[in-house]
Amino acid sequence: MRLMLCFLAVGLAAAEVTVEQVNKAIGLELFADANLWDDDAKAVAGRLNWPQESETTNDASYRLYPKEDYRLFECRPYSCSFLADQNKPTSLSLMFANKGDSVSIGAKDVKDRTKAKARDEQIKDYKKAIAADAKDLEEKLTKLFGKPTLGSMGNAQATREVVRRWNWNGHAFLLAAPKDEYVALRILSVKSADEGGRSRVSDAELFARAKSRVEKRPNGDVILKDIPMVNQGPKGYCVPATWERAMRYMGVPADMYVLAMAGQSGAGGGTSVVAIANGAKAAVTGAYRKIETVSIKVDPGTVDKYIDQGLPIMWAMFSTKEYNEIANGRTKERQGMTDPVAWKKAVADARKGQKPLQPNRNEGHVCMIVGYKKQTGEVAVSDSWGPDYEERWIMGVEATQVSQGTMTIIGF
């Protein structure tokens, strides 16, 4: 009874906090009134000045990678984002000190002792910063709303977070700080937080949705639309960012920072595809989806099996300078080309004398195969680098030359 009275007292105290007090504590005009969830998402993005990251038929995301002097709760955030469904905000995520953004020198960039020493210092500093941000944020939120309650988010051991939770007018403020990983403050509806952030899209609905996303263009392109974009930013998070895209596309809630923890990403980036798959498995299967790993040649005649079902393919490859030059140039050249026969001849002429692409093991990368064109032997790829990289085209034979041989599909 005493415990219930304590929770009730905390709840009443938090309810008395005004919108103005909350916005002042955050340092941002987040709330126009006491209910964020009925606001127009574009209006929210406008007053926050956060750019749109992605928009699909059903949802949208907005993300800002702030400058160094940007502050929220008087702490430095490295990534600020929110998701919206049917143009209404559904969740907000603030990522403070973390091992991905706080370490700018990746392991593969260490060429000499000076770089090695600088990287070691960054690793020491980010671990201290995580502890400091976690302490400061908890103190500020407690001062604002009262003492937190303890809970957890996520339905899988590898992606589960212990959180400190404060409720305010239908909003749950959740602070997570896994040791040496990151400090995240998320704002969800109380209902969503009570459900652990989980959601469920029925198989029938998802199957119909996936089939409707297969676009067959008059020029012969077959392309998947409505794949969420997640911009990994400057860190080496291509694997967790791509997995977040695929999981959200298949109706499974995901966050690249949590997936990076599950995949045991190194400081500054660098993640094992196998470790990510193992870490995400429980979340994917818990949503009644399945993970399939295949080793196939990158070719329209092999990827069509999945694309025609509305399923994107996560592809492990080597993203070399030469590969990207070809993909960028080819994509630009093919714009406006409506005749597959003429385009096939143009590509063949351009490739005369072209040397085979050479894989570089220092340029490991994971992206998506999202389309194909059988008349020309092309495949479409999508990278987690923002809208400019949502759809690029490359010959299947060229893609095979830089392929690591592993592809992963989240299916029904």
Locations of regions flagged by a protein language model:
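Solvent-exposed loop/turn segments at secondary-structure junctions
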Residues: 233-237, 244-245, 264-270, 298-300, ...
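Surface-exposed patches in mature extracellular/periplasmic domains of secreted proteins
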Residues: 150-154, 253-260, 288-298
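Sec-dependent signal peptide recognition
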Residues: 1-7
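Noncatalytic regulatory segments and standalone regulatory/sensor domains
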Residues: 167, 184-219, 341-412
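Long, charged/polar, surface-exposed segments that mediate recognition or autoinhibition
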Residues: 16, 35, 39-41, 46-158
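Active-site-adjacent structural segments surrounding the nucleophilic cysteine of cysteine proteases
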Residues: 16-41, 49, 53-54, 160-286
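Short, surface-exposed coil-to-beta transition loops
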Residues: 75-78, 159-161, 168-172, 361-367
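Predominantly the structural core of cysteine protease catalytic domains
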Residues: 270-374
